[in-house]
Amino acid sequence: MKKNIYLLFLFTSLYTVAQQKIPLTQPDSVQFMTEIVIKGFESDRRLLETPVSAGIVSRSDVQRFSTASLLPALNIVPGVRMEERSPGSYRLSIRGSLLRSPFGVRNVKVYWNDIPFTDAGGNTYFNLVDQHSIAQIEILKGPGGSLYGANTGGVIILHPEEPPFLQENISAEHHFRVQVNGGSYGLLDENAQWKYQDKNISSLLTQSHLQSDGYRQNTRVRRDVIQWNGSAHLSEKDKLDWILMYADMYYQTPGGLNMQQMQENPRQARPGTAFTPGAVEQKAAIYNKTPFAGISNRHNFNKNWSNITSVMLAYTDFKNPFITNFETRKETNLGLRTKMVYHAITGKQDLKFIAGMEWLHNYSAINNYGNQRGKADTIQFKDKIRARQVSPFVQGEWMMGKKFQLQAGIGSNFFIYRYRRLTDADDSKKKKKLDGQLLPRLAGLFLISENISLYASVSKGFSPPAIGEVRPSEGSFHRNLQPEYGWNREIGVRGRTLANRLQFDITAYRFRLNDAIVRRIDSADAEYFVNAGGTNQKGIETFAEYVLVQNTTAFIKSAKLRASITLNDFSFTDYMIDDKNYSGNDLTGVAKTIWAGGFDIATRWGLYLNTSFTHTSKLPLNDGNTFYAPSYNILLGRLGWKKQFNAFSVELFTGVDNALNQLYSLGNDVNAFGNRYYNPAPKRNYYGGLIVTL
């Protein structure tokens, strides 16, 4: 019924648009996704000419919704799922990799341009990223080990805004932008930016503050970020990119509820039991203070040879008063990535060769204490862990004429942990060294026509257990936990047609994962991880966008439809624990069907309306498939007005999230003890804001 309401609204809007006598869209008046240049796998080509399954999230995609979170924009990309157990507690997966992530991002590598953002322990604090400073998010789906080291889910590349350089007639320019966004449950999202640009330098200084009281008890969040990133042409041969960031984040963790508790009072935090106190009593929360610095230099030796070298340094002060303990972590992370690139064009042949390596090092001092109502008590464990990854790689790319392209690459990964428990009588060092892995990838692309391409690829992925999995919060060191690995095969077609009004991207894949790492929770609500045999993951991902109107002289100057469909057939294979056989069961936490649609319309007067509807089918909450989260439908909308004046522009907007007032859980605790799977998301809520640009 609720789906039908959205469809009725959609078709009514389309009928209104159709009644107007509007000229046809001109082919060169629309920027298509297939025309966006992809940087991943060293392509530097249009997506139409790149043999990789990729999703693109632009700044305009983020601004279709409340800009307090990246979640709605990322969840439109087929095969990608971002969850929010509570404000600030994000999880991000590509093609089912959420199975391993109680929070944050695991099994997916993240980069800021060429600068590594994921640490050697396999963890990424994605919730520290200030979405206001991102111009584009590039998502490479499927294993990327041939060029990006350890991962089986995929790769995410964050791109800042980069205006053109080396234009002699450009004088120094300063631009300022201020945004304030407020809403239900005490939401306040404030952002201020100063951008400087001349013919050699582009820099962006950003300050942002986010806070919310949250929908549930014990879900308050506060995040402050100051960031300076930019690019500079040091000479005709050298270009330097940099990022300096300091993030201070605090968010409360309410804990999961069972179905009865969620239905009785979805706003409550996890209550106490006869054996353990509740989340409110223990003041369960996360405190994260992280400075991060990265630089990347590109040097062109001549027209054929170049080198790109990136260095990163980060330090994290992490505290987590939890229901059963109080954990502190001091993490120091170092990273180096360097690659030599040879590129030559001779006649109809375009040849590119890349060779390089990535080195990541993590040192973590982890202490566990008792938790006395949010204060650290008696020491339980005191550990020191070092993790190191070395990933050499080579890749060749051959463009034969204008029709055919071949990519072939192979990488390797060498991984080692060193662990020492200082509170044990035997405090000798322990070591876990993984055998080196060869990670090949072969991909090809054929241009069927000027606007349609067909591609296919075969690749191997490898992902060692993260520090949080080898040494989870309950304090044990799981030396027997093995890395997961598998082969991925996929084929896809993409392009544009119907007088360039319609663009489409369709991918089918099969990924067989061995020794899959899955999360479990014990009776004390402490997490631990086990290898679960294997998984068989088959999927189809489709995306389509249709431009109804693109005409700046008409009253309705633009109108656009978009839709994405994700079909997942994921199951366990060879998975037994004790006497229980889970082989053939659906993969935990993965919905079989996700459908997302959107309709955007803008007028010459500056008025605009963005809508989005998402249907998520039921999904299993435990490996035994005895509990499922119900399906749900989410409707979002944003109404606004933009006006460009001589020296500045103004935008006013208001919006609604969960307009259908659904009761659902957007971040489930899979395999939770006591059936406490559910983290209820906010009911219908509203926001509004103002943007001023000078």
Language-model regions, residue ranges each:
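N-terminal periplasmic accessory domains that precede
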Residues: 70-73, 91-93, 108-111, 124-130, ...
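Extracytoplasmic beta-strand/coil segments of soluble accessory domains associated
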Residues: 71-115
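Short acidic/polar hinge/loop motifs at secondary-structure boundaries
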Residues: 115-141, 480
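Face-selective signature of the C-terminal outer-membrane beta-barrel domain
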Residues: 236-247, 283-424, 540, 544, ...
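Structural signature of Gram-negative outer-membrane beta-barrels, strongest in the C-terminal barrel
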Residues: 350-361, 383-512, 549, 558
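C-terminal beta-signal and adjacent terminal beta-strands/loops
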Residues: 509, 559, 618-620, 641-694
